[in-house]
Design a protein with these regions (language model features):
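Phosphate-handling active-site elements
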Residues: 103-105, 125-140, 228-237, 386
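Acidic/His- and Gly-rich active-site-bordering loop/insert found
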Residues: 2-110, 131-134, 320
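Acidic/histidine-rich catalytic neighborhood of metal-dependent amide-processing enzymes
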Residues: 115-189
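Metal-dependent amide/peptide-bond hydrolase catalytic core
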Residues: 1-5, 12, 29, 47, ...
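Short beta-strand segments
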Residues: 83-84, 142-144, 172-176, 199-201, ...
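Glycine/serine-rich anion-binding loops at beta->alpha junctions
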Residues: 90, 106-121, 206
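Flexible, glycine/proline-enriched loop segments at strand-loop-helix junctions
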Residues: 109-113, 144-150, 207-215
Length: 386
């Protein structure tokens, strides 16, 4: 294929897809708001219908539907899979009305960088390939619906569907965005994420009797949190206690308290070690009369460094160099993503190929407009090289 012609087509289509980017960010789609997530997928489905691509929708009861859009579905070769998530973090209305605005080279709004901008770059790449007559392989766009809540322990259906649809792919290109510090890198390794809920029961009594009776669930929680927060290994396991709830009034010894623990880990062995520490802290009674119930609330595996992902990056870098793009170093990210599940499935995968930006998961989130075309050009370079 004439890569120069494809790049020129990307440049020609770019402004149209910047508008698409703004449109989909204005459709607010928190993970638990199925109507909003489905509205985002409906927008992308309309683009696919206009191009005559194959569309498959996989219904979900609690979350947005998973959608698979395929260009060149009749090719007998193994597909290339692109994937990004449509859901965002914050409740509707936090960003104002409209939710999105442009400022210089930035689009501000929910999901601008994480991850709607990357999905738009994927559609831009597919549109340009289609317009330039690319028919070699199927190209699948897999739209995930609940990534931001961890594709969790009790809600794995969407990511399982993504992995099943991509299981024969020669490459899985995940479209998460990247900050300035990660520019020039491709993610081939990510930490895993586990969540735990500690529910502590104490003995409630009048505050004036606390010297001789009662057992404060909040005090027990405080001891446990201090012990857990000691675990902060730069390259390994980290513990963060992010939410605590306990007590009801000032003048009562609290009989109930609960807190949530976020765990990041680099490998399965790290996770097993972390679980032993957590269980030991849960079982230890610091305040006589208290007890603790421990529950794992979510689990996302680590994306461990592996040869097939490094081999795919080598192919990508050869294509980048050939096509006048800068090569990317192998990098590790401490945040989780669906690329971990995909890697565990045995599919060659590179992550963080979406748009540039900053401040993901905050009211100040933005994507860098000029990064859209570069992301699309990297994607078509890989697609035409594998």
């Amino acid at each position: 294929m004439d890569i120069k012609s494809i790049f020129n087509t990307i440049d020609k289509l770019n402004s149209r897809y910047v508008d698409v980017w703004e449109d989909v960010c204005n459709i607010e789609s928190p993970s638990n708001f199925k109507e909003g997530v489905d509205a985002v997928s409906a927008y992308f489905i309309a683009i696919a219908e206009s191009k005559g691509w194959k569309i498959e929708r996989f219904p979900e009861d609690r979350f947005g539907d998973v959608v698979c859009i395929t260009m060149n579905p009749d090719s007998d070769k193994a597909p290339v899979a692109l994937s990004g998530h449509m859901d965002t973090v914050h409740p509707i209305g936090l960003f104002g009305t409209p939710a999105t605005h442009r400022e210089g080279d930035r689009i501000h709004g929910p999901g601008a960088m994480d991850c709607k901008g990357g999905v738009v770059a994927g559609f831009l790449a597919m549109h340009a390939l289609d317009e330039c007559g690319y028919t070699d392989r199927p190209v699948k766009m897999l739209l995930q619906s609940n990534e931001e809540i961890g594709s969790g322990i009790n809600n794995k259906s969407p990511i399982k569907r993504i992995c099943e649809e991509a299981k024969n792919a020669v490459a899985f290109l995940n479209l998460e965005g990247h900050e300035e510090y990660f520019k020039g890198k491709a993610c081939v390794e990510r930490k895993g994420i586990a969540g735990f809920l500690f529910r502590i029961s104490g003995v409630s009594t009048h505050a004036s009797y606390c010297a001789r009776e009662g057992a404060s669930a909040i005090t027990e929680a405080a001891h446990k949190i201090i012990e857990l927060e000691k675990v902060k290994e730069e390259g390994g396991v980290t513990f963060n206690c992010g939410v605590i709830k306990g007590g009801s009034v000032r003048n009562t010894v609290p009989g109930e308290c609960e807190f949530q623990l976020d765990v990041r880990f680099s490998s399965q062995s790290d996770l097993e070690r972390a679980k032993k520490i957590i269980q030991q802290v849960a079982d230890t009674v610091y305040v006589p009369g208290c007890s603790c119930e421990l529950t794992m609330t979510n689990l996302r595996p680590a994306m461990e460094k592996c040869e097939r992902n490094l081999a795919l990056l080598a192919i990508a870098n050869a294509a980048f160099e050939k096509n006048g793009l800068t090569t990317l170093e192998a990098g590790m990210r401490t945040g989780g993503s669906d690329a971990a599940d995909v890697t565990e499935y045995g599919i060659p995968c590179i992550d963080s190929l979406g748009v540039g930006g900053e401040r993901a998961h905050s009211k100040e989130e933005f994507g860098v407009i000029s990064s859209l075309s570069e992301s699309a050009k990297r994607l078509v370079s890989i697609i035409t090289a594998v």
